[in-house]
């Protein structure tokens, strides 16, 4: 028996949308931009997949989404895109910032899919925040391991990076098919 799924996404520059379309294509379901979502329709789905991008470990658009989906929390799978290196500390920080109340992190699956960053496309607040991030990274690295990670991130901020790869959808697809 096949589960009925929906993929909801919030994408600013295309990475999250690309992953959402790949996931929806593999599951044979629809992908819907968050701004076009009919929250009343979520009850008909066995699996609700939400994807968005990270800004300072915050899942952009998730606050609004979370308030509307209390009845679907047990069917929720989340994927996030970003350019920072995935590690347990980043995962923990994402959880602490985004799962304070309403959704129990114990029952929610969260996956990281590496994203894309093109400096010339970044404007306004995002450009300002990336400049601050760069300064913090440069001044905050205290040991060789954190220094290497900071250097990699600074390079991505200055020169851009594209780590989008369909293989990162496999973890989300496995969870959706369980």
Model-predicted segments: where are they?
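FMN-binding flavodoxin-like domain, especially the glycine-rich phosphate-binding loop
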Residues: 26, 57-178
